[in-house]
Amino acid sequence: MSNIKLIVGLANPGEKYAQTRHNAGAWYVQELARVCGATLVADSKYFGLTARVTLHGKDVRLLIPSTFMNLSGKSVGAMANFFRIEADEILVAHDELDMEPGVAKFKLGGGHGGHNGLKDIIASLANNKGFYRLRIGIGHPGDKSQVSNYVLGKAPGTEQAAIEDVIDEAVRSTEVLFNQDMAKAMNRLHAYKA
């Protein structure tokens, strides 16, 4: 049974960024909310879109920060502080350059790997890196100088379909996480390739 009380999907706000690779974490939270029959609503107190869902009897908050990516910690910190949620009770879904589209993995702890959203969340949690992550593969452009344009661009059709397929599997694996445990959820998700 999971101890997670807050699930966060990282994104940049606005229509301009809605369909960009950098928003893959938000796509996961949007799909999770849809499956749970919840509606994400703007809440200025938490600087984001929020919903409250029940996953296998557990009360869980969903959050998509409406700050820009590099200020995600403002939103996560506000909600974690208000509800007294510890770092190891948080799951942050984010785009991952070092994995191909169609692959996603759960992970506990670690650094930010250059991801500005994770960097700001770590800072907002008093440098506590001990939160769970859902890393959603978006692939790498091959050239480090192209990363910014790449993550802020839209994936071509086949890559987008693979990302959406693995997000669907990540939502199913999240249900396993809450119904059973992280090890079983990891085994299921890590074996999947869209």
UniProtKB/Swiss-Prot annotation:
InterPro entries: Pept_tRNA_hydro, Pept_tRNA_hydro_CS, Pept_tRNA_hydro_sf. One of its GO terms (molecular function) is peptidyl-tRNA hydrolase activity. Belongs to the PTH family. One of its GO terms (cellular component) is cytoplasm. TRNA binds at Y17, F68, N70, N116. This is Peptidyl-tRNA hydrolase. It comes from the Bacteria. Disulfide bonds: none annotated. Pfam families: Pept_tRNA_hydro. It catalyses: an N-acyl-L-alpha-aminoacyl-tRNA + H2O = an N-acyl-L-amino acid + a tRNA + H(+). GO terms for biological process: protein quality control for misfolded or incompletely synthesized proteins; rescue of stalled ribosome. Keywords: Cytoplasm, Hydrolase, RNA-binding, tRNA-binding. The active site is at H22. The record marks D95 as: Stabilizes the basic form of H active site to accept a proton. Its EC number is 3.1.1.29. The record marks N12 as: Discriminates between blocked and unblocked aminoacyl-tRNA. Monomer.
